[in-house]
């Protein structure tokens, strides 16, 4: 009975199971970590009111509408299990259980396998390393199964490079020992799982940073302060990435200030310091920095400074005071040396009696002592004299420059009087007695005569004029009583001083003495000695008197005393040849004409050839030209007709003889050879013949090798000046061409003007004779220089009937210089011959004044 009951129940359940068939689609599932997947539970059968439930691997019933593992009841016959973002813990057997209304259950299971795909967990890119370090390239790979890691660079397995620096570590990281900049690039970390045939890779960019290197272009930079100049400090920095450069001054960061004291270049590698002064002297450090590190370089800026006097002080002392000290302080770098000078002496450069360097220097007379220490110098004056007063200049000097400052020493002293004690004059002649006064403070000056203060009613012919440095007593003697002693007294708060002056009555001078008479044909030079007594006043003039033997009338002439006294000679002119004369002299001063000397007889020479002229040379500024002055001497009683000049370089042939008019007083020799010795011979010629040759020797300068450059920054010609020069040159060239056409072809603008305006004959007319006074001396077909001499009408009066010019004391032998007329030589292939200029003398002839004694 019991067995039958159990059989019935078994059949009942089997019938129910058949009626509820449960299936899960898909029947199995593999999910990669992080992926999502769903499973559908389907129920087949006629049962109603079924309940479909899902259970997790740990047996817990999954509730609907969960976020990550979701269960959704679709209808009476299906339900969906969805696993979002699966992880390893979600793996296991999930069960779908269907419960009928009668309580019967049916179920199905699905085995969910969750595996880890080959993924790169930690493989950042780029990865940066410092050059030279051991670099480890990180590549963390995660996978359910252990992967095989391969590293590639430039498409090749790094292991195959056979570079011992490349090592794959046990954690599959790639190590590069002592990584280099050339190792930079893309490295591929490739993972493989053989069981699944799975492969994945990650490209990692490897960057090798190079630590910066920095080098100062100059480790020491010199500059000068207070000149408004700028100085640039330069650092050359390299590295990767490009390093940033910053600057410090004595450890403090330098910023780009608003006043633009500091200026930086775009990459800050250059630091410009504007308006350098002494405060800018410091140690500057340029710091280059990037990811790989930093490096610095030092630059020492040395700022030199021109000396500057920072302290001087004026001093006051009393005469005969023991000593006084003047002090001078100066700044500058290098430390300046200080020297002292006055307006009359350079104290520091004088020979020293003792010299303890650098502290003490003493002058030979021991009056001044200079002490110097560092930037301070003092000048001590001993036994003060009034002459020590005045300006003292201290000068500070170093290699950069110098500075000077003046200070003043005041010396207070009693008056000191000076002046000519004896003063000469004569009755009616006004004279000043000068009393020079030296005093500090200023002195009051008084004049006395016989104890009586001047001026007074008793001395109406006396006036007094005072200046800061002297007092003048103006006396106009009326009688002998006005001559005698006068007293000058000066008083200040230090003391007083008096000086006696004597007013002496002047006399006329004594007679000059004639030493010798040098007669010529028409002139005579009288040598004399000045009078032994001048009478107390200067001699103003000399009077010469002469007459021919047998004549009663004396001829006379006045000569300026200064000119006559220079050589002690007066020249009398207008004499007749072969005639005996007597001559005598007298001197004139302010008092009057003195005694006349005894007469001295002489006889003039017969008419003869002239005396040789005196020659004096003056080199031209160009160095290869010379002006030879012709100083006319005695003409021998017959007018000089002309001068003959010849010259040559020593050891060379003579240049063609040059004929100069008698009025010429110099000749210009140009285009001479450089650094050559020349000799010049000049002969004067009159109707009687030629004089002896005057000889003159000179040497030209060495040829300059270069024209000195002008150092002035503003010496260059402006564009306008250059254009002006070119225009003037062009105009001169046109004029030269026109002049050439005029003289050679009788055509051109000048010829047109001459024909139409001046009435000159046309090109076909016969040329007129040359004007008087113009001559050209040349030889046909000669290559010798052509000398053209132009002068005004020569005055050549008949020697027998007219008077002629002789040198005298008022007309010097050298006659007035006139504008030169050049005589240019022809051009040859050899060096240009000398160019000769002559200057005529058109001075008015001196007319001899005759006066009777």
From Swiss-Prot:
Domain Ig-like C2-type positions: 20-111, 116-205, 212-300, 307-412, 415-500
Subcellular location: Cell membrane
SMART domains recorded: FN3, IG, IGc2
Extracellular side stretches: 20-719
Keyword list, A-Z: Cell adhesion, Cell membrane, Disulfide bond, Glycoprotein, Immunoglobulin domain, Membrane, Phosphoprotein, Repeat, Signal, Transmembrane, Transmembrane helix
A Gene Ontology molecular function term of the record: cell-cell adhesion mediator activity
Residue intervals annotated with topology Cytoplasmic: 738-853
BP terms from Gene Ontology: axon guidance; dendrite self-avoidance; epithelial to mesenchymal transition; homophilic cell adhesion via plasma membrane adhesion molecules
Post-translational modification: Polysialylated by ST8SIA2 and ST8SIA4. Polysialylation modulates cell interactions by confering both attractive and repulsive properties that are highly regulated by ST8SIA2 and ST8SIA4. Polysialylation is formed on a-2,3-linked sialic acid of core glycans.
One GO CC term on file: plasma membrane
Pfam annotation, one family: fn3
Glycan-bearing residues: 222, 314, 346, 432, 458, 487
Membrane-spanning residues: 720-737
Signal sequence range: 1-19
Record region (Disordered): 764-853
Gene3D superfamilies: Immunoglobulins
Domain of life: Eukaryota
Binding of heparin, residues: 152-156, 161-165
Disulphide bridges: 41-96, 139-189, 235-286, 328-394, 435-488
Extent of Polar residues compositional bias: 838-853
Subunit and interaction comment: Interacts with MDK. Found in a complex with SLC39A6, SLC39A10 and with NCAM1; this complex controls NCAM1 phosphorylation and integration into focal adhesion complexes during epithelial-tomesenchymal transition. Interacts with synaptic plasticity regulator PANTS.
Summary of the function given for this chain in its UniProt record: This protein is a cell adhesion molecule involved in neuron-neuron adhesion, neurite fasciculation, outgrowth of neurites, etc.
Name of the protein described by the UniProt record: Neural cell adhesion molecule 1
Lineage of source species: Eukaryota, Metazoa, Chordata, Craniata, Vertebrata
């Amino acid at each position: 009975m019991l067995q039958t009951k159990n059989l019935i129940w078994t059949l009942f359940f089997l019938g129910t199971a058949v009626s509820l068939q449960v299936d899960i689609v898909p029947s199995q599932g593999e999910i990669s970590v992080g992926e999502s997947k769903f499973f559908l539970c389907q129920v087949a059968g006629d049962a109603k009111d079924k309940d479909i439930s899902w259970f997790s691997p740990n047996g817990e019933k999954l509730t609907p509408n969960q976020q990550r593992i979701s269960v959704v009841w679709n209808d009476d016959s299906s339900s969906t299990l969805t696993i979002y973002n699966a992880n390893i813990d979600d793996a296991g057997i999930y069960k779908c259980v269907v419960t009928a209304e009668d309580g019967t259950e049916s179920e199905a299971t699905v085995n969910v396998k969750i595996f880890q795909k080959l993924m790169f967990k930690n493989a950042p890119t780029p990865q940066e390393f410092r050059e030279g370090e051991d670099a480890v390239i990180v590549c963390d790979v995660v996978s359910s199964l252990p992967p095989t890691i391969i590293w590639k660079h430039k498409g090749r397995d790094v292991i195959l490079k056979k570079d011992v620096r490349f090592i794959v570590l046990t954690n599959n990281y790639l190590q590069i020992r002592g990584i280099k900049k050339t190792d930079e690039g893309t490295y591929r970390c490739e993972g493989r799982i053989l069981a699944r045939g799975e492969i994945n890779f990650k490209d990692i960019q490897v960057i090798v940073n190079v630590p910066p290197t920095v080098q100062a272009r100059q480790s020491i930079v010199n500059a000068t302060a207070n000149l408004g100049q700028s100085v640039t400090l330069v650092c050359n920095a390299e590295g990767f990435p490009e390093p940033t450069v910053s600057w410090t001054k004595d450890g403090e960061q330098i910023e780009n200030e608003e006043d633009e004291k500091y200026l930086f270049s775009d990459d800050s590698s250059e630091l410009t310091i504007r308006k350098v002064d002494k405060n800018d002297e410091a140690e500057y450090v340029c710091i280059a920095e990037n990811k790989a590190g930093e490096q610095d370089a030092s630059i020492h800026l040395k700022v030199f400074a021109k000396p500057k006097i920072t302290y001087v002080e004026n001093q006051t002392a009393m005469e005969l005071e023991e000593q006084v000290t003047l002090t001078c302080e100066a700044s500058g770098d290098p430390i300046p040396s200080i020297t002292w000078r006055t307006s009359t002496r350079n104290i520091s450069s004088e020979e020293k009696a003792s010299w303890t360097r650098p502290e003490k220097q003493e002058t030979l007379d021991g009056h001044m002592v200079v002490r110097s220490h560092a930037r301070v110098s003092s000048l001590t004056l001993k036994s003060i004299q009034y002459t020590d007063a005045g300006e003292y200049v201290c000068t500070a000097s170093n290699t950069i420059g110098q500075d000077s400052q003046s200070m003043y020493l005041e010396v207070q002293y009693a008056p000191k009087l000076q002046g000519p004690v004896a003063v000469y004059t004569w009755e009616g002649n006004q004279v000043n007695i000068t009393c020079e006064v030296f005093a500090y403070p200023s002195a009051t000056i008084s004049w006395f005569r016989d104890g009586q203060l001047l001026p007074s009613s008793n001395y109406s012919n006396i006036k007094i004029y005072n200046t800061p440095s002297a007092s003048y007593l103006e006396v106009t003697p009326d009688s002998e009583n006005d001559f005698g002693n006068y007293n000058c007294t000066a008083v200040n708060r230090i003391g007083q001083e008096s000086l006696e002056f004597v007013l002496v009555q002047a006399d006329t001078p004594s007679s000059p003495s004639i030493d010798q008479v040098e007669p010529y044909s028409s002139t005579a030079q009288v040598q004399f000695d000045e009078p032994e007594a001048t009478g107390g006043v200067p001699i103003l003039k000399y009077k010469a008197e002469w007459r021919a033997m047998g004549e009663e009338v004396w001829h006379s002439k006045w000569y300026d005393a200064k000119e006559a006294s220079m050589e002690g000679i007066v020249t009398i002119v207008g004499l007749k040849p072969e005639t005996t004369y007597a001559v005598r002299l007298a001197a004139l001063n302010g008092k009057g004409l003195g005694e006349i000397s005894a007469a001295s007889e002489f006889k003039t020479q017969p008419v003869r050839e002239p005396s040789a002229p005196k020659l004096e040379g003056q080199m031209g500024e160009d160095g290869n030209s010379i002006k030879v002055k012709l100083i006319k001497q005695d003409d021998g009683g017959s007018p000089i007709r002309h001068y003959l000049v010849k010259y040559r370089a020593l050891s060379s042939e003579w240049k063609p003889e040059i004929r100069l008019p008698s009025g010429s007083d110099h000749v210009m020799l140009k285009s001479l050879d450089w650094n050559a010795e020349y000799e010049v011979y000049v002969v004067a010629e009159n109707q009687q013949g030629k004089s002896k040759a005057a000889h003159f020797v000179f040497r030209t300068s060495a040829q300059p090798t270069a024209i000195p450059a002008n150092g002035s920054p503003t010496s260059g010609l402006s564009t306008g000046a250059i254009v002006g020069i070119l225009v003037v040159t062009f105009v001169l060239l046109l004029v030269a061409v026109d002049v050439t056409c005029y003289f050679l072809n009788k055509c051109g603008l000048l010829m047109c003007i001459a024909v139409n305006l001046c009435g000159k004959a046309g090109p076909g007319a016969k040329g007129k004779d040359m004007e008087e006074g113009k001559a050209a001396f040349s030889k046909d077909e000669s290559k010798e220089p052509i000398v053209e001499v132009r002068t005004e009408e020569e005055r050549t009066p008949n020697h027998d009937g007219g008077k002629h010019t002789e040198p005298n004391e008022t007309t010097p032998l050298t006659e007035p210089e006139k504008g030169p007329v050049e005589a240019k030589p022809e051009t040859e292939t050899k060096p240009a011959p000398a160019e000769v200029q002559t200057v005529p003398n058109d001075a008015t002839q001196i007319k001899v004044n005759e006066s009777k004694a």
